């Protein structure tokens, strides 16, 4: 017979009472009705908030987007292969946020800020909401500092300032990403943090960009956010907001930042896919009604902050891909109306050998003029007009048999100006080099150089200035002004290089 020991029973009871936890946890739990195509319908989440993070039974995360009478429509931020009908879903009470901090520099992350470059976890202590409010009017300052891209055609004719939103738009394979990467490379030693967001691209293309930045020492001040083509639509939709949040962290610390969204057409397509699967009513081109708001709330986060806010800035270079040069389609017109100007790349110019293939006639920078450095502003004033007139005359001259001398001269100069602005990929130029090249073309100092030698002239002039006239480069780089002395040095250098080239051509 088992003997009952009262002291043992009382000891167990005391232990149980001591260990008793009075805290009551309340969780908002529902169950999956249907799942498929990256969308889950959940029943029972009565208290769910719009945009709230949901946690599924298999660990997959989702975002509540549609709050309906009897169910919640959620998008999955993962494959969700372990989610079944009837499995439980828990509302976390949190909005999606990403880790931010200095440790992100040099890393490749996904849309949730998790490392995907095989270098281990990123040690950050701070997080930031993926969706956050854009700075208000009082917190901003007008754009007044230049953001040099290193591409002569842009810095001379379509200048971009820190805090500006400048759209890069064009057909596929016209060099849109090349301009963005060159801009990142040109920020070396400029104390600027760059964030490159790749949306819906091939993993090989992203790996190529990372390798280019690493080889040229630009990865040290850059963060890559990648949502590849194979990833769920929800992650492709979130990637630009993640990039903006990472850049915002540095902006509010007083740093200058640059964010490239490559490209927002694919983000809009991902958002359209999600919206249609959630049974939201389609609008023009089957995009949902709030696709404009989707882009405007992202691009409004770019700003030049006031002195009281720390003087930081976020410059945004969104990229949009057009179909057969149609800039009047829905998404291109939306983003053109949101941004402060656009750089239009033409496939015809690209195929004719003009790289970068910028169509000067319809490219514009609405606020960048105030930020342009005086040195280049003074000499490049007529450049855009001359090139636009040249394009018009060139089209007209195809039908005219005999042209007067002034028209002929304008055509010849236009050809040389166009050649001067050619620039190979991954070779951004410093301000002094741009000033020298544009000055030579606009002032007509290379009219004697054969058209096929203009690219050689450009290269040799830069080499001559570096080796023989370093004082010119130093003065322009430091003072950002062209003094009469510097102009005299430049004229001598140009005539020296021109005479050498003309002699060799003869």
From Swiss-Prot:
Membrane topology: Peripheral membrane protein
Reaction(s) catalysed by this chain's protein: ATP + H2O + 4 H(+)(in) = ADP + phosphate + 5 H(+)(out)
Alphabetized SUPFAM superfamilies for the sequence: C-terminal domain of alpha and beta subunits of F1 ATP synthase (SSF47917), N-terminal domain of alpha and beta subunits of F1 ATP synthase (SSF50615), P-loop containing nucleoside triphosphate hydrolases (SSF52540)
Task performed by this protein: Produces ATP from ADP in the presence of a proton gradient across the membrane. The alpha chain is a regulatory subunit.
Database matches in Gene3D superfamilies: 2.40.30.20, ATP synthase alpha/beta chain, C-terminal domain, P-loop containing nucleotide triphosphate hydrolases
Enzyme Commission number(s) from the entry: 7.1.2.2
Organism in which the protein naturally occurs: Parasynechococcus marenigrum (strain WH8102)
Similarity field: Belongs to the ATPase alpha/beta chains family.
Protein name stated in the entry: ATP synthase subunit alpha
Keywords annotated in UniProt: ATP synthesis, ATP-binding, CF(1), Hydrogen ion transport, Ion transport, Membrane, Nucleotide-binding, Thylakoid, Translocase, Transport
PANTHER family, alphabetized: ATP SYNTHASE SUBUNIT ALPHA, MITOCHONDRIAL (PTHR48082:SF2)
Subunit structure: F-type ATPases have 2 components, CF(1) - the catalytic core - and CF(0) - the membrane proton channel. CF(1) has five subunits: alpha(3), beta(3), gamma(1), delta(1), epsilon(1). CF(0) has four main subunits: a(1), b(1), b'(1) and c(9-12).
Listed GO CC annotations: plasma membrane-derived thylakoid membrane; proton-transporting ATP synthase complex
Localization: Cellular thylakoid membrane
Residues holding ATP: 170-177
PROSITE patterns the record matches: ATPASE_ALPHA_BETA
GO molecular function, one term: ATP binding
Site feature (Required for activity) residues: 363
Superkingdom: Bacteria
